[in-house]
Amino acid sequence: MNTLGRFLRLTTFGESHGDVIGGVLDGMPSGIKIDYALLENEMKRRQGGRNVFITPRKEDDKVEITSGVFEDFSTGTPIGFLIHNQRARSKDYDNIKNLFRPSHADFTYFHKYGIRDFRGGGRSSARESAIRVAAGAFAKMLLREIGIVCESGIIKIGGIEAKNYDFNHALKSEIFALDKEQEEAQKTAIQNAIKNHDSIGGVALIRARSAKTNQKLPIGLGQGLYAKLDAKIAEAMMGFNGVKAVEIGKGVESSLLKGSEYNDLMNQKGFLSNRSGGVLGGMSNGEEIIVRVHFKPTPSIFQPQQTIDINGNECECLLKGRHDPCIAIRGSVVCESLLSLVLADMVLLNLTSKIEYLKTIYNEN
């Protein structure tokens, strides 16, 4: 499947070295002002070639909107958009066209479909995530109308973990580091991996909060069983390249605690803690939504590796090309976009939760 969402549905298409990648965002309400500066800024945050800590492949990533927008406002019809691939170097992959790169999707794609586009991984490449970021920008325009903000940053590179979380600093950091004090050590870890022709894993922190200080997020986003907010968040994140684990709130640490240590107590003003990460019973509880996304090391490394070819013969794989030494860095921006898409979808889903909402809509007509 190539579609994410229920009421706000994103369908993507295209391959890493094809002419274009593209998307169709269906379900966007009409009347939303299109913020082209926001769209451009989101694409630049994900863009490669900005520094030594990410892939040298720098695409222009100009988003060409083909439908669903008229006179700078959404029309309520599907928003179609394209991004042209202009700097692919397919020759870098000629030597591995009959090999399975270790820990890539080559092996599974070939066995499932009997054919694979070996150029940059084809459809399995994270190049497709540029479309998710563009779609996430449209979702952010919707969320802004109701005062929801999503943001992200890096909390861990290898074993070096942030002790403080500063999302404003992350916006200025070359690696989107949340902790200024740990940033240099995290950068050094990445540089050491590069020197050794290796890669390194990392963890991104994604947060949704109210746009206004001292205000809460909407309560009740999500549904209690088969459209749980935390389940949909995890589904979206796990559907992105390189993600191996997703935590909501305390996540894995929750299994080590007693109920008396974990429970979020309440008083008349609200919750006294947020170990649940803003989700209870599959629905938002008004607190900040906290998501940690764990990325494996980039499988594309420049060391000789043992593998097999498409005929099952053992051989050596030595990669060329341009690759991220740590996919968590740009991946954090993609996950922020995915959280925006999930929340926007849940906002639209919530319109059907009470008859009063429908009466309000139709009585106005």
Curated annotation (Swiss-Prot):
<keyword id="KW-0285">Flavoprotein</keyword>
<comment type="subunit">
    <text>Homotetramer.</text>
</comment>
<dbReference type="GO" id="GO:0004107">
    <property type="term" value="F:chorismate synthase activity"/>
</dbReference>
<keyword id="KW-0057">Aromatic amino acid biosynthesis</keyword>
<dbReference type="GO" id="GO:0005829">
    <property type="term" value="C:cytosol"/>
</dbReference>
<dbReference type="InterPro" id="IPR035904">
    <property type="entry name" value="Chorismate_synth_AroC_sf"/>
</dbReference>
<keyword id="KW-0028">Amino-acid biosynthesis</keyword>
<keyword id="KW-0274">FAD</keyword>
<keyword id="KW-0521">NADP</keyword>
<comment type="function">
    <text>This reaction introduces a second double bond into the aromatic ring system.</text>
</comment>
<feature type="binding site">
    <location>
        <begin position="241"/>
        <end position="242"/>
    </location>
    <ligand>
        <name>FMN</name>
    </ligand>
</feature>
<dbReference type="GO" id="GO:0010181">
    <property type="term" value="F:FMN binding"/>
</dbReference>
<comment type="pathway">
    <text>Metabolic intermediate biosynthesis; chorismate biosynthesis; chorismate from D-erythrose 4-phosphate and phosphoenolpyruvate: step 7/7.</text>
</comment>
<keyword id="KW-0456">Lyase</keyword>
<dbReference type="GO" id="GO:0009423">
    <property type="term" value="P:chorismate biosynthetic process"/>
</dbReference>
<dbReference type="GO" id="GO:0008652">
    <property type="term" value="P:amino acid biosynthetic process"/>
</dbReference>
<comment type="similarity">
    <text>Belongs to the chorismate synthase family.</text>
</comment>
<feature type="binding site">
    <location>
        <position position="46"/>
    </location>
    <ligand>
        <name>NADP(+)</name>
    </ligand>
</feature>
<dbReference type="InterPro" id="IPR000453">
    <property type="entry name" value="Chorismate_synth"/>
</dbReference>
<dbReference type="Pfam" id="PF01264">
    <property type="entry name" value="Chorismate_synt"/>
</dbReference>
<feature type="binding site">
    <location>
        <begin position="123"/>
        <end position="125"/>
    </location>
    <ligand>
        <name>FMN</name>
    </ligand>
</feature>
<feature type="binding site">
    <location>
        <begin position="296"/>
        <end position="300"/>
    </location>
    <ligand>
        <name>FMN</name>
    </ligand>
</feature>
<keyword id="KW-0288">FMN</keyword>
<protein>
    <recommendedName>
        <fullName>Chorismate synthase</fullName>
        <ecNumber>4.2.3.5</ecNumber>
    </recommendedName>
</protein>
<dbReference type="InterPro" id="IPR020541">
    <property type="entry name" value="Chorismate_synthase_CS"/>
</dbReference>
<feature type="binding site">
    <location>
        <position position="322"/>
    </location>
    <ligand>
        <name>FMN</name>
    </ligand>
</feature>
<feature type="binding site">
    <location>
        <position position="281"/>
    </location>
    <ligand>
        <name>FMN</name>
    </ligand>
</feature>
<dbReference type="GO" id="GO:0009073">
    <property type="term" value="P:aromatic amino acid family biosynthetic process"/>
</dbReference>
